[in-house]
Amino acid sequence: MCGRYDLSENPAGIRAHFDVPSVPQFTPSRDVRPTERAPIIRVNPLSIKRESILARWGLVPAWAKDLKFGSRCINARIERLVTAQAYRTAFRNRRCLVPVSGFFEWSGTSGQRTKWRICPQDQPFFGLAGLWERWFDPGSGEPVDTYTIVTTAANGTLAGLHDRMPVIVTPDRYASWLDPTCMQMDLFVPVTEAGLRIEPA
C-alpha cells in the first residue's frame, strides 16, 4: 500500500525530469496525503502531448455519486486493473505518472512503529504508475481531476514492511506506461532493491 508520500522537489525539477513544458504551482510537501492535490504527469487527451496537472489523490470514476468514493481508491491493485469497474476504463485510456521524492511505510507494532522512507538511489524522483479520471460535481458541474497509485506485490526488504508496494516506472519506460496501448509485462514487475534507498523517516 502507499498511503503517504514525499514530494519535496520544486516544479522546475519535475518539469526537467518528466520532460513537460510546465508544472502547476504547488507547495512541496514531505507528507502528501489522500484527498490532497498534487502534480501528476499525463498525456493530454486532446493535444496528445505530455503535460502536468494538479489532481486530487483518490480516484473518483465519472459514475461515482460524490468525492467520498475516492477515499476507497487511493491505491489500485495491479491484479484488478482490467476487471475492477473503478479502474478498467482508466487503465485502457487514462494512465499517468505520479512524481514522488519518496514514499513511506511503517514497521513494528502499535505504539512502537518505525516510519521508513523509500526513495530513489540515484535520481531525484520516482515516477509511480497511476491512473487518472475526471469527475464532474453534480451540483456545480465543475470538473475534478483525480488519481490513484497502482500497487503490486512487494519484493525484497520492502516485503518485510508491507505486502504491497507502488509500481515504480523507470525513466526509460515513462512513455510506454503513458501509452495505454502498451501492455509490456515488464512494466508491471517490481523494481529491484538496487534502485532503492530505505532509511528511517
Where are these regions (language model features)?
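Short linear sequence motif anchored by a di-proline
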Residues: 1-201
